[in-house]
Amino acid sequence: MEQDRTNHVEGNRLSPFLIPSPPICQTEPLATKLQNGSPLPERAHPEVNGDTKWHSFKSYYGIPCMKGSQNSRVSPDFTQESRGYSKCLQNGGIKRTVSEPSLSGLLQIKKLKQDQKANGERRNFGVSQERNPGESSQPNVSDLSDKKESVSSVAQENAVKDFTSFSTHNCSGPENPELQILNEQEGKSANYHDKNIVLLKNKAVLMPNGATVSASSVEHTHGELLEKTLSQYYPDCVSIAVQKTTSHINAINSQATNELSCEITHPSHTSGQINSAQTSNSELPPKPAAVVSEACDADDADNASKLAAMLNTCSFQKPEQLQQQKSVFEICPSPAENNIQGTTKLASGEEFCSGSSSNLQAPGGSSERYLKQNEMNGAYFKQSSVFTKDSFSATTTPPPPSQLLLSPPPPLPQVPQLPSEGKSTLNGGVLEEHHHYPNQSNTTLLREVKIEGKPEAPPSQSPNPSTHVCSPSPMLSERPQNNCVNRNDIQTAGTMTVPLCSEKTRPMSEHLKHNPPIFGSSGELQDNCQQLMRNKEQEILKGRDKEQTRDLVPPTQHYLKPGWIELKAPRFHQAESHLKRNEASLPSILQYQPNLSNQMTSKQYTGNSNMPGGLPRQAYTQKTTQLEHKSQMYQVEMNQGQSQGTVDQHLQFQKPSHQVHFSKTDHLPKAHVQSLCGTRFHFQQRADSQTEKLMSPVLKQHLNQQASETEPFSNSHLLQHKPHKQAAQTQPSQSSHLPQNQQQQQKLQIKNKEEILQTFPHPQSNNDQQREGSFFGQTKVEECFHGENQYSKSSEFETHNVQMGLEEVQNINRRNSPYSQTMKSSACKIQVSCSNNTHLVSENKEQTTHPELFAGNKTQNLHHMQYFPNNVIPKQDLLHRCFQEQEQKSQQASVLQGYKNRNQDMSGQQAAQLAQQRYLIHNHANVFPVPDQGGSHTQTPPQKDTQKHAALRWHLLQKQEQQQTQQPQTESCHSQMHRPIKVEPGCKPHACMHTAPPENKTWKKVTKQENPPASCDNVQQKSIIETMEQHLKQFHAKSLFDHKALTLKSQKQVKVEMSGPVTVLTRQTTAAELDSHTPALEQQTTSSEKTPTKRTAASVLNNFIESPSKLLDTPIKNLLDTPVKTQYDFPSCRCVEQIIEKDEGPFYTHLGAGPNVAAIREIMEERFGQKGKAIRIERVIYTGKEGKSSQGCPIAKWVVRRSSSEEKLLCLVRERAGHTCEAAVIVILILVWEGIPLSLADKLYSELTETLRKYGTLTNRRCALNEERTCACQGLDPETCGASFSFGCSWSMYYNGCKFARSKIPRKFKLLGDDPKEEEKLESHLQNLSTLMAPTYKKLAPDAYNNQIEYEHRAPECRLGLKEGRPFSGVTACLDFCAHAHRDLHNMQNGSTLVCTLTREDNREFGGKPEDEQLHVLPLYKVSDVDEFGSVEAQEEKKRSGAIQVLSSFRRKVRMLAEPVKTCRQRKLEAKKAAAEKLSSLENSSNKNEKEKSAPSRTKQTENASQAKQLAELLRLSGPVMQQSQQPQPLQKQPPQPQQQQRPQQQQPHHPQTESVNSYSASGSTNPYMRRPNPVSPYPNSSHTSDIYGSTSPMNFYSTSSQAAGSYLNSSNPMNPYPGLLNQNTQYPSYQCNGNLSVDNCSPYLGSYSPQSQPMDLYRYPSQDPLSKLSLPPIHTLYQPRFGNSQSFTSKYLGYGNQNMQGDGFSSCTIRPNVHHVGKLPPYPTHEMDGHFMGATSRLPPNLSNPNMDYKNGEHHSPSHIIHNYSAAPGMFNSSLHALHLQNKENDMLSHTANGLSKMLPALNHDRTACVQGGLHKLSDANGQEKQPLALVQGVASGAEDNDEVWSDSEQSFLDPDIGGVAVAPTHGSILIECAKRELHATTPLKNPNRNHPTRISLVFYQHKSMNEPKHGLALWEAKMAEKAREKEEECEKYGPDYVPQKSHGKKVKREPAEPHETSEPTYLRFIKSLAERTMSVTTDSTVTTSPYAFTRVTGPYNRYI
């Protein structure tokens, strides 16, 4: 269940991804295991899954199966790491365990997450790492563990090793450090690729078993981390918060909601580490980046990495982190923002994402997660950017982009770094980045990976140095992009990683090659993207072009932009990945990308495998990502659009710029852009939308260029995009435009790029960093920088390059010296703080920049304001701040102040320049101080205070500045920037505005252009500033439990709620708030971007406290609330694009799964402890075609029997078509032949038989009947019929939990009377048995067992068993009970059902042939042609020996009911209606006749009473007479009638044998068939109706009902209504499954006359006899022929069909046979009958007109017989039914009279049809035999009696070899294990059921869903009732004491399907009246049409009514 929950959560967030994820997860073992929830047993396989994923990684290196690989790749690490827990996780037990906030919980969670990853939630470990502490944590844990090791050694080497080991974990061994690293990176890449990972994040939400993670996260993280985050990030956060307070809040809100839900909830499972990862990352940097750095770099790197990355901050930092998170939630800009800032930055970017996130959130949190990841990416890039970068850099420094696409190669270098810092970074960063990557990070990763990969490309050329340099460069560039800290971190990671990069680059490149497919395939990203794309498809198209342009251009900006582009692109990539997932072409494109990447890699690979493959892939992926991202972005609303637009503008601008100084400027811009775009991507993705709008001309030009690139690829978009990007990156350096030559030149360019990158790898990286810093810092300048500063950027770039070089050197040093790196990592993390802040700033800045690009003004203002806070200044400032805070706290404060002042004074550009200088200084400081910072990790907290103050100061200054700026252009720009940050839509408009300015224009121009959007931004800015101030105030002043709700007026409508250190950002606000809060921005924002909530801000925190899931966006929550059945875990595998259970069968692995049958044998031998012949495995094939008899009852076609006494265990396995993964073969059934001792079995048989015979109370079960409810498979004698008895606890829909929720003293083994001794005796038997069976269950299906005992201690009252280990909650004893095919949908998910069989004494010896036996059938499976070992001969031998008995079509007598058994609801409804009708009829009836009629109808006809009564009124004469006659008749046939009544009551058709048979044949059979015609005569019913009029049985066949109805309406209106009724009646259950189309068609009529319809049914079967006698069968005939498929027959009946049918009607059996024949062969007997019927019909019409009533009166005998039948049938149901039937009869007669056709005929027809349908093959024979009797009116009686004996040969099921029906013959004492929830199963009917001496007793042990609450859920119920009472009180207060809730009304609507009939009665009655008023219509009898539709001939005056 927990897994289910996870799935639900996953479904919530990953729902879309679940499917894509499954492909990812279906990587084989993991998929299988995780899906099965039995990862432990298959831990090796889960490992294998990880390995497989690794193998997939490895084997899939070049394979585009990255989808599976992605998750898989991520999975391996986690899988390995979490092997111990995988089982639990899979089982879901650990998930809960993991929900512990403790680290151990975290570790468990990590491991669990692994499992989850295996479950498909693990797939996105990277993302999951943030989201899924388990998953994210898992890698995180792995990383952290590794990181701890690496951190402890603080050696990037160790990091690498750890990463490698992590990878190895992924890879299944540190044997391939490179591969492992690749694996890890790929895993991360997979994570990244897993845009699915986004899902993971979402899954993280899923994973969390509650708010545990929340608790952990909040508990640990928020306190310190929040403060630190606030202090460190606060400046950024402040600025960002100001900028993106809304967006931040939005991000936080959405992310808080999602993340709290997700991460907190997720972390629940993941111990909150994921939150920590995001929060931690965010927070860690806020902690001071140093903390993060320390955490990442130092052992803390391990812990921080682990904790921080894993939201550890989760266990160790969790309080802080959560506090930070809370704080972040509280204070958008505060450290919580770290996560949330990352989130917020993402939020800023994701503001759009937020708005988008609304979309994203709406998509199920996927997008949101994506956004979150984007946010986190931003946060990650900003806050966790270090981690992300580091982790991304270290793990994916080259692979950040690469990791998405190039992840495998580039991440290798970074992997090394990642382990120490990279790991923590990776964990934090990668986790966040992964989260981002799946969301934003995916984009960022793509870009970053691209950037890094690109930078790695040069390293590629000089493998180690180049990679080294390249990695640092990408790292730096990415860090700048992501964060200053990130830069440093990345540099650290990059530095360390780069060396590894060269080594690992190739593997990673290979991996990347695979990863890109993974990336491309990332289903989750794709899903997110898809979701986003749906929202943003247009934007995506634009954004894609833009992004492509951007990508094309960014390749020039390769380093900078790729990172950001990756930020952007990854989103796009996610989007595109989603697309890919959606569009197989996309994965192939992505895969193609990898190929291009690989090719490029091969070219560039020489130098840097990572770079070539990685860069191309990055470029490609970035493009892809951008494309996808664009899709996502656009999906992500404007956030991505703007970011894209910005990026595109940036790209456009940087295109030349890129081309100008591709290495430097381009890299920086690109990285910058990417970084910004990444962050801003959320931001600017909206901006992109806006940009697209604003910059559409320029952008479009760019995009057109890109489009030329991109669009050539639009599907290959990703592929080309990436190469374009690379080419663009290369080309820009080549100063050739990306768009045109990009793809061609991409490879070369990639090489060139790589060379260039190599040439400027560090410079670019450093420049990127510094330029990012300066770019960010000098955003205004750099805004122009892209344009005007492109030139200066060259120089600047070089300066930056130098600075970057220093940083890079430091990074390299860090890389070289783990401790140095750790220190640097710390510094980087400090930088991350700064960088994250800066990144936030960068993001904002780049968002600003891009907005500038897009909306020239925005960038400057943003630069000035937001840029300063979010972009350059925050980045610089933050870097500065972080470093300064760390190094120069006071200096930072002064600098910050100065910077703020400067920003204020200097307008955007000067401030930006200052910021850039500072940033450079900071970069230098960072570069050098980074190590110090790493060393001065401890400094970070103090610096945090300083930073906090500085941040506050800065925030205030920035506020002022922003205000000032807002007033001028800066103001508008800033506000716009803020707005974009705040409001994605706002950004989007900015993006549009940005779009307006040429992207190539200088940033200044862009900034100016951004000014116009400022108006909107001003509002937001103000709110952001206010919010920031409030946040600061709250943060500083708020008491721990002070709760405030801040409503930010951002597009996202972020609500910030703070309670002490916990800040909850909710994006959801009321629509009114939305309207009021985001006037300008909201106007800009699309409605999709708005996520109004019904909850007030104040309630959010409370709700969160109550349940984190309540914080989820509504769409996500709805997903959570959706039934589990649709959210099964699909393991990710590469075998198929999408798992279609309809085709391959249900997928689950908790009974066992393996790659082949031999593996299953190994598993089962290991479990069972015996080998060889003791275990028998049979292959079965899923066909999806249900084998059943003509009546719809179970049949067996193959019987698998015990072959010998040596055989102890039988295992049925299904080979999943098209799968070669670890779950290619799954176990679907396990049968232990000797399950319990025979002595015990004997004793239980006798004891249970005796007890249940005397005291048992039958349990009505729907599966007791066929779909028509007409079979008597349980027997007809209520005293002996088969029955089921339920004991123990079961699920109740009323309580949504245990049915004993309100019981003070629940009697779980309740028997008749009050005999506690008997109950105790029975209980002891069943408790002992359940205790005995549990160990067997545990041994044979450990995964399912573990799933079922997960909550044993929580809900002991709902468990059976006397010892520890109680998997069962209830048991059902079935005695000779024929269970029709069904699934036990109420069972818990990932559990199974155990059936203990006890047989009669004559069936206990092996080899004996019992007189009768009951088989357990799987109706959808057929036996394989080969045996376990693939031998056809051996299989044939089994068939010869009897081990497999092949059955053939055999005739057998079947028991059918005269009419369908009514449901309890119907019976209640009828009784209720009868009473009501009685009163109304007494009051309103003007005639005694009416009164009499109404009274009987009221009493006997509840549903149809009113209609029948009205009809009777219309036909009063006939009505009363009919009633009278019917009444007497019921008396006559009372014996059968009571039986029938009993039968309906018991819902077991066995009671009324005679009446049942007659009724059944005449009416019941037809009724059900009309309702749901059986294979033979499902159509006859309709046919008849149709035939009567349309006489086109074939056509009628299809539109039977409608035709019948239409025909009736047309030819005989009265008939029509009645046929409608008849059809309706037949349709009554609306079972048209068997093809009773007529029922469907008639449904309108049925609906209209449903009450009558039923009576007609009842009437019908009674009328069967009477009809034959009455010669009313014309309509009946029509029905039958049509039903029988005899067109000519039907046609005949149309003219004289009534008569013919009448003949049929006369002997319902005969008629049925006719019909039956008609069904089989159109109707030769029918023809004979036709003549007969024609005569009868001829006679009948006279009868019909007057005789109808006369008939009812006069033909008392026939009618009386009919009535008798009717009475019996009605009696069966109720007297009211009886009356109703009579009325129906009257009505029928009336209609008939009106139509000239007796309505009784339709009834009879129905009867006949039913009989025929009922599989009255006998009737066919009987038809011949009874034709004469049919001719005779009296013949009907015998016919009705004959109906009792219906024969079926089930021939149709045997004719088609693909129709299933594999049965096993359970023996005495055997135990059968199967997943009854997922597999359709049945038990065959017995020849002579006798529950007093049963042939078989089956004791079914199960555990229902939601049986996990103590005391049967009493507390929950009481709370629910209290809530209802409170609501009632509120309603009373609101509406007054007299207010009555509309409860009953709603129920009435549900309960009273008859009411609609009443409503239609007026029409119906009017119709009948009008028909009756006119002359009888002459039915046409010679109409035979071969057309699909019957020609309805309407004759008579009433045709005008048709």
From Swiss-Prot:
Interacts with HCFC1. Interacts with OGT. Interacts with PROSER1; this interaction mediates TET2 O-GlcNAcylation and stability by promoting the interaction between OGT and TET2. Directly interacts (via C-terminus) with the DCAF1 component of the CRL4(VprBP) E3 ubiquitin-protein ligase complex. The lineage of its organism: Eukaryota, Metazoa, Chordata, Craniata, Vertebrata. The modification Phosphoserine is found at S15, S75, S99, S1107, S1109. Residues 1290-1303 are annotated as: Interaction with DNA. Pfam families: Tet_JBP. Dioxygenase that catalyzes the conversion of the modified genomic base 5-methylcytosine (5mC) into 5-hydroxymethylcytosine (5hmC) and plays a key role in active DNA demethylation. Has a preference for 5-hydroxymethylcytosine in CpG motifs. Also mediates subsequent conversion of 5hmC into 5-formylcytosine (5fC), and conversion of 5fC to 5-carboxylcytosine (5caC). Conversion of 5mC into 5hmC, 5fC and 5caC probably constitutes the first step in cytosine demethylation. Changing R1261G: Loss of enzyme activity. One of its GO terms (cellular component) is nucleoplasm. CDD domains: TET2. Changing R1896S: In a myeloproliferative disorder; somatic mutation. May be glycosylated. It is unclear whether interaction with OGT leads to GlcNAcylation. According to a report, it is not GlcNAcylated by OGT. In contrast, another group reports GlcNAcylation by OGT in mouse ortholog. Monoubiquitinated at Lys-1299 by the DCX (DDB1-CUL4-X-box) E3 ubiquitin-protein ligase complex called CRL4(VprBP) or CUL4A-RBX1-DDB1-DCAF1/VPRBP complex; this modification promotes binding to DNA. Coiled coil: none annotated. Residues 1-22, 113-154, 266-287, 349-368, 390-488, 703-748, 930-949, 1075-1095, 1475-1507, 1521-1587, 1932-1961 are annotated as: Disordered. Changing H1382R: In IMD75; loss of methylcytosine dioxygenase activity. Changing A1919V: In a myeloproliferative disorder; somatic mutation. Belongs to the TET family. Changing N1387A: Near loss of enzyme activity. The gene is TET2. Changing R1302G: In primary myelofibrosis and chronic myelomonocytic leukemia samples; loss of interaction with DCAF1, monoubiquitination and of 5-methylcytosine demethylase activity in vivo, when tested in a heterologous system. Changing D666G: In a chronic myelomonocytic leukemia sample; somatic mutation. Changing R1214W: In a myelodysplastic syndrome; somatic mutation in a chronic myelomonocytic leukemia sample. It comes from the Eukaryota. Changing H1757D: In a chronic myelomonocytic leukemia sample; somatic mutation. One of its GO terms (biological process) is myeloid cell differentiation. It comes from Homo sapiens (Human). Changing C1811R: In a chronic myelomonocytic leukemia sample; somatic mutation. Changing P1367S: In a chronic myelomonocytic leukemia sample. Changing P1962L: In a myelodysplastic syndrome. This is Methylcytosine dioxygenase TET2.
